[in-house]
UniProtKB/Swiss-Prot annotation:
Belongs to the peptidase S1 family. Snake venom subfamily. The active site is at H43 (charge relay system), D88 (charge relay system), S177 (charge relay system). GO terms for biological process: proteolysis. This is Thrombin-like enzyme gyroxin analog. It comes from Lachesis muta muta. It holds the Pfam family Trypsin.
Length: 228
């Protein structure tokens, strides 16, 4: 996250860290939505992944930190009008909720335009050069209406959200992918894509719109993985 500050240790209990299981490289963020399921971005996928829950500083382990790996992964492939950007990961075994681990509930309503939203992650804090922090950074950004989004990115599909600061300087960045966009306390977006370098004026970040995928997410969790 560019232009943010170290997150409060208690504000990101649902934020998970995805690591490449072979190289041990930090890849992406993700969001815990219940004891067995994590949502992230599809391009974060690797054949082997470790998922760390309850982490703050990458180099200092909490007593209640837990590690899981994907038991099964599901990608959205149901409707050509939707972006194929998100990934549901079923964990190999349920997570124990604790002081530093609790889920973020799915949204009950779509986000209202002009919401102030919170983003967070262990992604780049400078762009360029690439500086990765040991602790997650958090920032507040604004949700933009779809016209602003299309103005910045004319070929943008519809099932997305754009958020940022029009004058630039605050934005999600590389390796924040997969983490949450939280608007008015609700989990509304998944970090997907943005300009390179990050945090440019008039170039908001792009997020998968969680509300538009609720039926699919809930059916996958319920065990129905076919498209209705």
């Amino acid at each position: 996250v560019i232009g943010g500050d170290e997150c409060n240790i208690n504000e990101h209990r649902f934020l998970v860290a995805l690591y490449d299981g072979l190289s041990g490289t930090f890849l992406c963020g993700g969001t815990l939505i219940n004891q067995e399921w994590v949502l992230t971005a599809q391009h974060c996928n690797r054949s082997l992944m470790n998922i760390y829950l309850g982490m703050h500083n990458k180099n200092v382990k909490f007593d209640d930190e837990q590690r899981r790996y994907p038991k099964k992964k599901y990608f959205f492939r149901c409707n050509k009008n939707f972006t194929k950007w998100d990934e549901d990961i079923r964990l190999n075994r349920p997570v124990r909720f604790s002081a530093h681990i609790e889920p973020l509930s799915l949204p009950s309503n779509p986000p209202s335009e002009d919401s102030v939203c919170r983003v967070m992650g262990w992604g780049q804090i400078t762009s360029p050069p690439e500086t990765l922090p040991d602790v997650p950074h958090c920032a507040n950004i604004n949700l933009f209406n779809y016209t602003v989004c299309r103005g910045a990115y004319p070929r943008m599909p519809t099932k997305v959200l754009c958020a940022g600061v029009l004058e630039g300087g605050i934005d999600t960045c590389n390796r924040d992918s997969g983490g949450p966009l939280i608007c008015n306390g609700q989990f509304q977006g998944i970090v997907f894509w943005g300009p390179d370098p990050c945090a440019q004026p008039d170039k908001p970040g792009v997020y998968t719109k969680v509300f538009d995928y609720l039926d699919w997410i809930q059916s996958v969790i319920a065990g129905n993985t076919t498209c209705s």
